[in-house]
């Protein structure tokens, strides 16, 4: 039979009743003859509780000690789930990231997986045992506990699935799959039966929060079939896999992603000379701030306006950096706007269809929505607009590309 790696997030294991429900679900797979490795997150709210304890002690906690602290959340969950499985007659054993030898680099709070020793897991599976692994954590070459960053349990699950050559990695969440857009914004949004790694990666990077970006990258790199399912409602979910032969009537657009957590900054009137972009963005990068979209407008007077977006949480820090940079460059002004949003259309069908961007722009214009910035890739068009128009834009685009009227055939 098949080998499944299943991941259950914090909401799915948020109470002991929900842990019991997960145990029932896992047991049903075992009863059907499948091998199961389960990866779990900390119970909902537990990681935040642990972080608040650290904050009560110091506002500058040591990263190594933070990893030791927050990794305890998953340790509670793996033990409770094993107890629930054993109560149901299932042989089960729990492993921390250290015990299962998920070896990472030493970048505390944001470590990356280097390799996994799966021998112990394989030996357990041969005896019919369910293996329950703590997500989000690992150990470096020196024996220090490390964590993979927020959402790292998804990455743990995919990495284990790749190392074990599992038939499928199943991510159980509080939604029943990947939708054409957020159903809370468009109530006629539809669940997709299938989506490519490439599309899912674009949607995740553009604001869709169903899957963590690193896990999608990992799955695509090692060709691990991913399936997003609900912990609470039975259904087929959404399969994320390599691009294969598509139906003749393949949709141009698979989904609409959006992100409210953006802020825009502009340095006005800097000299249009070689290296100016580096002089602006270098200090931003040195402050460990990620830049998203970039636009440079050159004027006739040999000056340029340089605009880019960052995460809204970094807005004030970036303004401070840019004010210093602007003074050094002789900039006319530094402007900022935290009341923006990004809306993106995503679909591999763009490769073979012309006029997709034009249709997007026409749709927004018809709603009197001004486009402030544009970014494109082979399968994505993203725009920045005023945040107050976000939901109107998403609904209009969802309708224009017939995502809420089409029978799903993917």
List the model feature ranges, each with a label.
Residues 1-216, 309, 384-386, 401, ...:
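Nucleotide/pyrophosphate-binding catalytic subdomain
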Residues 32, 88, 222, 287, ...:
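Conserved dinucleotide-binding and phosphotransfer motif residues
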Residues 43, 175-177, 222-226, 230-235, ...:
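Glycine-rich beta-alpha junction loops
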Residues 57, 237-410:
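A conserved regulatory-domain signal marking ACT and ACT-like small-molecule sensing domains
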Residues 91-93, 225, 290, 370:
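Conserved beta-strand segments of alpha/beta enzyme cores
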Residues 168-172, 226-228, 292, 373:
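Short hydrophobic alpha-helical runs that function as membrane-insertion/retention elements
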Residues 219:
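Acidic-aromatic/histidine active-site loop/patch
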């Amino acid at each position: 039979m098949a080998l499944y790696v299943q991941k259950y997030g914090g909401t799915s294991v948020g109470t002991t009743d929900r842990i019991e429900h997960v145990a029932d679900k896992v047991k049903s797979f075992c009863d059907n003859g499948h091998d199961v490795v389960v990866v779990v997150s900390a119970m909902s709210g537990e990681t935040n509780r642990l972080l608040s304890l650290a904050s009560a002690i110091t506002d500058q906690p040591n990263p190594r000690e933070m990893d030791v602290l927050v990794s305890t959340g998953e340790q509670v969950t793996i033990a409770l789930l094993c107890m629930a499985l054993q109560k149901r007659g299932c042989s089960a054993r729990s492993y921390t990231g250290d015990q299962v030898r998920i070896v990472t680099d030493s970048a505390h709070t944001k470590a990356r997986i280097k390799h996994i020793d799966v021998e112990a897991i394989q030996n357990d599976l041969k005896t019919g045992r369910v293996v329950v692994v703590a997500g989000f954590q690992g150990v470096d070459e020196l024996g220090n506990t490390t964590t993979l960053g927020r959402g790292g349990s998804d990455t743990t699950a995919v990495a284990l699935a790749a190392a074990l050559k599992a038939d499928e990695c199943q991510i159980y969440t509080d939604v029943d799959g990947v939708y054409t857009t957020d159903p809370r914004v468009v109530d006629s949004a539809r669940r997709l039966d299938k989506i490519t790694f490439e599309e899912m990666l674009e949607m995740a990077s553009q604001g869709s929060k169903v899957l963590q970006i690193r896990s999608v990258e990992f799955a695509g790199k090692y060709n691990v079939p991913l399936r997003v399912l609900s912990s609470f409602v039975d259904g087929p979910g959404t399969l994320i896999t390599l691009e294969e032969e598509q139906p003749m009537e393949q949709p141009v657009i698979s989904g609409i992603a959006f992100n409210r957590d953006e802020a825009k900054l502009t340095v006005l009137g800097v000299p249009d000379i070689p290296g100016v972009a580096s002089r602006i963005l270098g200090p931003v990068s040195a402050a460990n701030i990620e830049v998203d979209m970039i636009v440079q407008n050159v004027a006739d007077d040999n000056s340029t306006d340089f605009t880019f977006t960052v995460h809204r949480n970094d807005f004030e820090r970036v303004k401070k950096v840019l004010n210093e940079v602007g003074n050094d460059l002789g900039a006319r002004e530094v402007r900022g706007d935290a009341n923006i949003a990004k809306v993106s259309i995503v679909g591999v069908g763009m490769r073979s269809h012309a006029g997709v961007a034009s249709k997007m722009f026409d749709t927004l214009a018809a709603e009197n929505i001004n486009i402030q910035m544009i970014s494109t890739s082979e399968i994505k068009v993203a725009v920045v607009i005023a945040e107050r128009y976000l939901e109107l834009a998403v609904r209009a685009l969802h309708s224009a590309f017939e995502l809420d009227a089409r029978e799903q055939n993917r």
